[in-house]
Amino acid sequence: AYKDKGAPTIDDFCRILVREAVAEGVDPRVVYAQAMLETGYLQFGADVLPGQCNFCGLGATGAGQKGAVFENVALGLRAQVQHLKAYGSKDSLVNACVDPRFSFVSRGVAPYVEGLGGRWAISATYGYSLSKIIDSFS
C-alpha cells in the first residue's frame, strides 16, 4: 500500500519509523506500538484511510473526521513522533515541525507512555494499551 509513499515493504516502513523516532529521542517501540494500535496493525478500517499516511489518528476525532493527511510515510511517521515528543518532553524538535497539532499539546505532560491516557485519546487506559503491546515485544 505504501510503495508509492516511500515504504514498499514493512522493513522499509520500520526503518523509517526507527530513523524518525531516534532523531527526536522518542522510543521507536512506542511509535510502533501506537501505529499498530491506531491502524489495527496497518489494516485501518476506521475514519483514517491508508493513503493519508496518518499512522496515529492525528486530527481524527471520530464521526467521519478523517484527520491529517501526509504526502508520504516518512512525513506521517515524523508527525507522529513529533506529537509523542510534545507530550513526553519540553525539548525542542530536531526536524522542522510537520505535526499540524503540535502547538495544541501541553508540552511534557506525559513523560511516560501510560500518561497518554485521557490525553492522546479519550480512553483513560490508552497508554496502558500501548504498554501491553510494547511488553509483547520481549
Task: Give the positions of each predicted feature.
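Catalytic cores of secreted/periplasmic lytic hydrolases that degrade extracellular macromolecules
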Residues: 1-138
